[in-house]
Amino acid sequence: MKLGSYHKNLTTSKNIIRDISAALNWVQEKYPKKKISIVGFCFGGHAAVIAPSLKGIDSTFCFYGAEVTAPRKNTNFAPKDLLEKVSGKLNFICGSSDDLIPLQDRLEIKKRFKKLDPLEERFIYVEVKGADHGFMCEERESFHENASLIGWNLLMKELN
């Protein structure tokens, strides 16, 4: 966990955008007619909120992505500031008991999603009562069967 946090703290949003952009360009070149979806968990979820600001991403799933409401170090914008640029679908799935995504952050994300998409067709916010950080991983103590089923069902519905 400490090593992961160390590496996470070395990243910047600009580097995340650069890396995702390079991967996106490669995929679009190799598979020009395919639908592109991005899935991220935890810090990958954080990156998944940044990713759909790039053109060409059809759907994105952010599972318990933390730190999306404040700027990262060496960056003058927060991931939430990029939401207006999203052209595809963005799903944000979190748990109500996740201390890494405080209530204030969850409320802000939910409010932004509702403002950008009142009908909830492109910006989908799902908060599962009682679920903690890491609820999708069966190997973790925080695994939450109901939240996991909700998450997998949303994901599989989009990908099929």
Where are these regions (language model features)?
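N-terminal cap/leader regions of alpha/beta-hydrolase-fold enzymes
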Residues: 1-160
